[in-house]
Amino acid sequence: MAQKINKWRHTHMSEKQFMLLLSVPTGFLAGLSAIIIKKLAHYIRDYFYNIATHDDHYGLLFFILPAIGILLTIIFCRYFLKRDVGHGIPGILYAIQKNKGAVKPYNTFASIITSSLTVGFGGSVGLEGPSVSTGSAIGSNIGQLLRLNQKNIVVLIGMGCAAALASIFQAPITGIIFAIEVFMIDISMASLIPII
């Protein structure tokens, strides 16, 4: 499939146009993943803390619930995922520097589940890192699926990062600046336009 798409692309559009075209599904999927992370974490939090506020041991549950969230995250990683989720933004930076931008496919969904459980049960972590990691993993995997070169994969990582941050903070300029500052090695108009 990737060969057919690449063959069609080479005959019908330039590389810049193709990257601009890829910005739509990459941005949509990365933004959607950030919304899913946020909504799922808030749903879990609202559900369990609503139960906790109606319990006689109200204060004790606020210590127990985060431990349950961490335990569920460990169980998911150990028995279902059977590997470490990764290290968020540093993991993406490592993939850019050492793996030609290749992020493992499981990173597109693992942080959605683990961060939603941890934060939803009251763990003291934020949703920004997992959102950036998931959005970047989506961009990387789209690039790998289409067998793009490292430069274009890094641009797709930047697209995913910017879209995820823009979605979770509802601040698109912040997402763009963060993606350029943290992930983009080569800043040119050809790589900047699709991120915007």
What would you call each of these model-derived segments?
Residues 1-196:
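Alpha-helical transmembrane segments and immediately membrane-proximal extracytoplasmic
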